[in-house]
């Protein structure tokens, strides 16, 4: 980081809080386009084209101020989308530069917050699976959950105000506001789901930064409100998985927002409330009464409406009883069920049968939504019958087989924590036959004739690969391997949800 600061002359900019001059540094756009840090430092083999030159950036900013370049009417917005894929406008260049520069104050503040503190800096994202042991430990002892979808988007000026509290360069904020306001249909852009998808795909770094800024502001206020209740302090467990350079875990919000609030939230004292979030969906779990959960519901609605000026109806927040409803989260269906057991106890000549029914979190694969995702990706039809998938003609048989195996492996790893793994056999069966039909279609044959020609061992890896993977980790007896394969296995290297598993 010290070498990075020296290269970008960040110390000088940090002293004066100047970000605007960085817009006219060409290496900023090299940073935006290149993903290898060594190439930034050496300025060798820079991976951006001549369209990202400093001259073009200066012309773009000049034309922005002249009001004759970015004004787009509603009629030709489809042809001339400012935030779309039209490379002739070069709008993506500026948005990427904005994203790189505006992250600098956050990164520097993060590093300074670690100075003098005994906190281990980790730049690797925690695995998604790490949250499930936490849920297994806590949810069986709780009564109610609340599914909360964080409303977005918010008004453009609210985003600017959020950034203003952390970015002190008025010139930079003015240009950022001007840059966003130049799009005449901005309000339409940020309201429709389709437009949000287009914006996030064409400008992912910029979109994620704006979204994360909104989420950080919301969660800092929300956790602060939770701490203000005398007996309602929050136990928080979660990670900002979708962020790019906001490395801080949610457990350390106390340090990040210490300057914003006079009272530092305490997260690890009271077991009444638990908060978990991934992307725009969060869960509040509590052991208390529905009355308390209703209070929290209206706290959230008032927070969104009064502070962020986002309309949100209380009916969007659902309060469910854990014993009667399943929890749809992170591609799994989770429910709390009784696990009855009988224990025989003998004292002297008398024996007793003790009925015990502890609660257990049952985590299963949502087979119907998962088949729907496979059908949407053209691996099967709506009824789950495998079909051949269109592939490029120049792909070899090995490449086609390897692609199917990679998809099967990713799904198997992600759903390795399911308590009922037999349902995964159906998914593997669909992928296996889809692979066979795809290869048979390439060779202009039938699936039966193709299997007869190559042998059934050709696709056996779909069913044996998971056990072989476990055998590398646990080199023990076959009985132990079978027990491990039937049990739950949580992997610590899964940092995002597979696209097929994310069926929401």
From Swiss-Prot:
Gene Ontology cellular component annotations, sorted alphabetically: chloroplast
Sorted UniProt keywords: Chloroplast, mRNA processing, Plastid, RNA-binding, tRNA processing
Effect of residue 41 to T: In haplotypes F, G and H
InterPro entries with a match to the protein in the record: Domain_X (IPR024937), Maturase_MatK (IPR002866), Maturase_MatK_N (IPR024942)
Main location: plastid
Subcellular location: Plastid, Chloroplast
UniProt-reported outcome of changing residue 451 to F: In haplotype G
Gene Ontology molecular function terms on file: RNA binding
Function: Usually encoded in the trnK tRNA gene intron. Probably assists in splicing its own and other chloroplast group II introns.
Entry's family note: Belongs to the intron maturase 2 family. MatK subfamily.
Name used for this protein in its record: Maturase K
Species per Swiss-Prot/TrEMBL record: Fagus crenata
């Amino acid at each position: 980081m010290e070498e990075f600061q020296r290269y970008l002359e960040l110390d000088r900019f940090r002293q004066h809080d100047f970000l605007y001059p960085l817009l006219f540094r060409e290496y900023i756009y090299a940073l935006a386009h290149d993903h290898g840090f060594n190439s930034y430092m050496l300025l060798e083999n820079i991976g951006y084209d001549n369209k990202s030159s400093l001259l073009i950036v200066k012309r773009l900013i000049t034309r922005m101020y002249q009001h004759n370049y970015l004004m787009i009417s509603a009629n030709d917005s489809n042809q001339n989308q400012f935030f779309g894929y039209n490379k002739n406008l070069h709008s993506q260049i500026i948005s990427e530069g904005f994203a790189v520069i505006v992250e600098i104050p956050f990164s520097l503040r993060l590093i300074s917050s670690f100075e003098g503190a005994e906190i281990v800096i980790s730049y690797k994202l925690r695995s998604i699976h790490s949250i499930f042991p936490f849920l297994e430990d806590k949810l069986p002892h709780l009564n109610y959950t609340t599914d909360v979808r964080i409303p977005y988007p918010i008004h453009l000026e609210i985003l600017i105000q959020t950034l203003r509290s952390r970015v002190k360069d008025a010139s930079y904020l003015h240009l950022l506001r001007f840059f966003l306001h130049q799009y005449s249909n901005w309000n339409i852009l940020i309201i429709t789901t389709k437009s949000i998808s287009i914006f996030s795909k064409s400008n992912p770094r910029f979109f994620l930064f704006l979204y994360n800024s909104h989420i950080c502001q919301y969660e800092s206020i929300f956790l602060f409100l939770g701490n203000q209740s005398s007996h309602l302090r929050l136990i928080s467990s979660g990670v900002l998985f979708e962020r790019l350079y906001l490395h801080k875990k949610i457990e350390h919000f106390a340090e990040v927002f210490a300057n914003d609030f006079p009272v530092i939230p305490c997260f690890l004292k009271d077991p009444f409330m638990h908060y978990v979030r991934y992307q725009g969906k969060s869960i509040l779990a509590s052991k208390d009464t529905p009355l308390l959960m209703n209070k929290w519901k209206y706290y959230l609605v008032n927070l969104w409406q009064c502070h962020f000026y986002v309309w949100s109806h209380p009916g969007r927040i659902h309060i469910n009883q854990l014993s009667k409803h399943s929890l749809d989260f992170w591609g799994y269906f989770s429910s709390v069920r009784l696990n009855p057991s009988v224990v025989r106890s003998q004292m002297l000549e008398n024996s007793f049968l003790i009925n015990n029914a502890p609660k257990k979190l049952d985590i299963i694969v949502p087979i119907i939504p998962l088949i729907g995702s496979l059908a949407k990706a053209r691996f099967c039809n709506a009824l789950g019958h495998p079909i051949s998938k269109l592939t490029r003609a120049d792909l070899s048989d090995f490449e086609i087989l390897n692609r199917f195996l990679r998809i099967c492996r990713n799904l198997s790893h992600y759903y390795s924590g399911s308590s009922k793994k037999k349902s995964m056999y159906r998914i593997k069966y669909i992928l296996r036959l889809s692979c066979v039909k795809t290869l048979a279609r390439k060779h202009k044959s039938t699936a039966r004739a193709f299997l007869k020609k190559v042998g059934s061992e050709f696709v056996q890896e779909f069913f044996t690969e998971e056990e072989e993977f476990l055998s590398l980790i646990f080199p023990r007896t076959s009985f132990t391997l079978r027990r491990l394969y039937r049990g739950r296995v949580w992997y610590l290297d899964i940092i995002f949800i597979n696209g097929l598993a994310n069926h929401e």
